[in-house]
Design a protein with these regions (language model features):
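Expand to "…catalyze enediolate/carbanion chemistry for C-C bond making/breaking, isomerization
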Residues: 1-188
């Protein structure tokens, strides 16, 4: 079940109506903290938008990172949606129209790994650099860890982040994420 909430009262109404179901509450990134806290207190999951069909719909990286850090500290599960068609951050067409404008989009790999690293304890400015990383070749993936520069997260860290905080992401496309994972040799 999903719903949108711009107030803590709206979060409470969604919680009351979703009793017995796993519910995601879409909250705005602007002034998200009281809403995210209310979502967590009610045992719900958060949802935030990370893009759209215009450049203005993409949040500032610092705002998204602030949300991720807060969700990890509070152990509030969340999913991200919109604009996450691509593996890595980069400049891409905003729609599937041939003459579409381009904009800078987050990569689903960046967003998830940022959550995994933060959940595993990353507290310095490196998390923002990770969220902004554009080169998949800067990552080394093995059967027991993912390394980025001199930092790494184990598969147990990744599993914990996936189970506890960064539970899913939404993309308008199934093929693009899978194709880009194949192209980067991250999946067979």
């Amino acid at each position: 079940i999903e719903g949108k909430a711009a107030t803590t009262d709206a979060v409470a109404r969604i919680a009351d109506g979703a009793s017995g179901f796993r519910a995601f509450v879409e909250i705005p990134l602007a002034d998200f903290a009281p809403l995210l806290d209310a979502v967590g207190e009610r045992g719900l999951n958060a949802k935030v938008r990370t893009g759209g069909v215009t450049g203005e719909m993409f949040p500032e990286p610092e705002a998204l990172l602030n949300f991720i850090e807060h969700a990890c500290r509070a152990n509030v599960p969340f999913k991200t949606t919109a604009g996450l068609h691509h593996l890595m951050r980069g400049d891409y067409r905003l729609t599937y129209d041939a003459d579409s404008r381009k904009g800078t989009m987050f990569g689903f790999f960046n967003v998830f790994l940022t959550a995994a690293f933060v959940h595993a304890g990353m507290t310095d400015g490196a998390a923002l650099a990770l969220l902004l990383e554009r080169d998949v070749k800067k990552f080394f993936v093995s059967s027991n860890a993912i390394r980025w520069g001199d930092r790494s997260v184990t598969t147990n860290d990744i599993r914990a982040a996936r189970d506890c905080v960064a539970v899913s992401f939404g993309s308008c496309s199934f093929r693009e994420p899978v194709d880009e994972l194949h192209a980067a040799a991250l999946i067979p």
